[in-house]
A protein has these predicted regions:
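N-terminal glycine-rich phosphate-binding loop and ensuing alpha1 helix
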Residues: 1-68, 97
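Structural beta-sheet core signal
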Residues: 3-5, 52, 125, 150-153, ...
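A structural signal for short hydrophobic beta-strand segments in well-ordered beta-sheet cores
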Residues: 26, 163-166, 222
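Short loop segments at secondary-structure junctions
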Residues: 31-32, 102, 168-170, 193-196
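Well-ordered alpha-helical segments embedded in enzymatic catalytic cores
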Residues: 34-37, 109-112, 210
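Conserved beta-loop-beta/alpha segment of the NTase-like Rossmann-fold superfamily
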Residues: 61-167
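Catalytic-core segments of class I nucleotidyltransferases/pyrophosphorylases
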Residues: 121-124, 131-144, 156-159, 171-264
Length: 264
């Protein structure tokens, strides 16, 4: 199944300076950028056809893959000056690099790569900046068995804030942590059918337009995930993931638990 990755946004909260043009999916976690970790997750489950929706800082993403160094995350033997890899990461990946505009909303980026999805009843999509250990095969199978146009992974609210219940007299009736409320957030992992394109207007958004319309029609399903899920919307969040990687605490690296692929 093909995987569409949205990796053309500015990622302003991740920028370290006025001249920093590195897109958020290229922020490093360990020796590899975020986008690599997301792609390696999908590849672990057999999904190795990727469509990258490029925009801001596209050359960074192109350069990374055009000059990809397998020895960074794989064991190898140096024999007579020649490198013999004992395993590889991306040798079986097919990657389409598609320029989808600098200012384009997510929905418009998806519209602009639709021709790369011709003939695919279902496909996967992702923001390319969120890591998880969610069971992807289960997510796909549950969606395939449903008569729906889209599925989104949802997670409990990540905020550490508390909600305060007020009475008319100004007295506090209760305090509840946001994470304990019966609310769910968009987790950024999607399984989609071609039907979704019928609900995304020009310059529209995947969630606010496409998913919202499907929800009104009862054709949007959710996959609830309470396991590991971490965004990288800020420098602090990215740094926390990088530190966890260095300590060997990387639950999103499902390929490592299987004993194959990238190593520390």
């Amino acid at each position: 199944m093909k995987v569409v990755l949205f990796c053309g946004g500015y990622g302003m909260r991740m920028r370290s300076g006025a001249c920093d043009d590195v897109p958020k999916p290229m922020a490093m976690v360990g020796p590899r950028p975020l986008i690599w970790h997301v792609m390696r997750y999908y590849a672990h489950f057999g999904h190795t056809e990727f469509i990258l929706c490029l925009g801001y800082g596209a050359h960074h993403i192109k350069d990374f893959f055009l000059n990809y160094e397998e020895t960074t995350s794989n064991d190898f033997v140096l024999r007579g000056g020649r490198t013999e890899l004992l395993s590889t990461d991306i040798s079986d990946w097919t990657i389409t690099f598609a320029q989808t505009g600098i200012e384009s909303p997510i929905g418009e980026r998806l519209r602009r790569v639709r021709h790369h999805l011709d003939g695919d009843e279902m496909f996967l999509a992702n923001y390319a900046d969120v890591l998880t250990d969610a069971p992807l095969p289960e997510m796909i199978d549950r969606f395939a068995a449903r008569d729906a146009g889209a599925s989104m992974m949802v997670v409990p609210p990540q905020s550490s804030f508390h909600c305060v219940e007020l009475g008319e007299d100004g007295l506090v009736g209760g305090i509840t942590a946001v994470g304990e409320l019966p609310l769910w957030e968009n987790g950024g992992y999607f399984v989609l059918r071609q039907e979704v394109f019928d609900h995304i207007p020009e310059n529209g958004d995947l969630v606010a337009d496409g998913c919202a319309q499907l929800a009104k029609q009862g054709r949007l399903v959710a996959h609830q995930h309470r396991g590991f899920w971490k965004p990288t919307d800020t420098v602090k969040e990215r740094a926390a993931l990088d530190a966890a990687y260095a300590q060997g605490d990387r639950p999103w690296a499902v390929w490592e638990r299987a004993g194959v692929g990238a190593r520390a």
